[in-house]
Regions:
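Extended beta-strand/beta-hairpin segments
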Residues: 1-43, 53-134
Length: 134
């Protein structure tokens, strides 16, 4: 079982702690002293799919040198203002097979990334892949 908690610290800031014991500061207001809960959802999505892609490319022995996943998202105008559209942009460095990268991204989206699976219930997720040599 995974557990998490958020403890109010001040203003609209919280200290979030999960089963791993690591803590993060969360800012639920517009003060922007830390990431908001909805920003953390997007960061979680980026990290989830990135870890899948890295794992798959390593298993295929693809010589990638860097990977960054960015998310651009739109939210519904009315509460609870869920994400309705998310564009994931994968930026891959190195002399990698484009097919291998595309397969890894597809597998992450369709099979492995649990965050993506949850968000796809309310949001259309689209993909873009950018390649560059380092």
């Amino acid at each position: 079982m995974v557990e998490a908690r958020a403890r109010w610290t001040d203003q609209e800031r919280f200290l979030g702690i999960a089963t791993s014991g690591h803590a993060i500061v969360i800012d639920a207001a517009t003060e922007k002293t830390a990431n908001s809960p909805m920003e953390l959802v997007l960061i979680g999505l980026c990290a989830c799919t990135a870890s899948d892609v890295v794992s798959i490319l390593r298993k295929k022995r693809e010589p990638f040198t860097s990977l960054e996943v960015r998310a651009q998202a739109e939210r519904a105008p009315n509460p609870p203002s869920v994400y309705t559209e998310i564009k994931l942009i994968y930026r891959v460095g190195g002399k990698v097979s484009r097919k291998a990268v595309e397969d890894a991204v597809r597998l992450s989206k369709e099979k492995y990334c649990s965050v993506s699976a949850m968000l796809q219930k309310t949001a259309k997720i689209t993909i873009a892949i950018e390649y560059f040599d380092e």
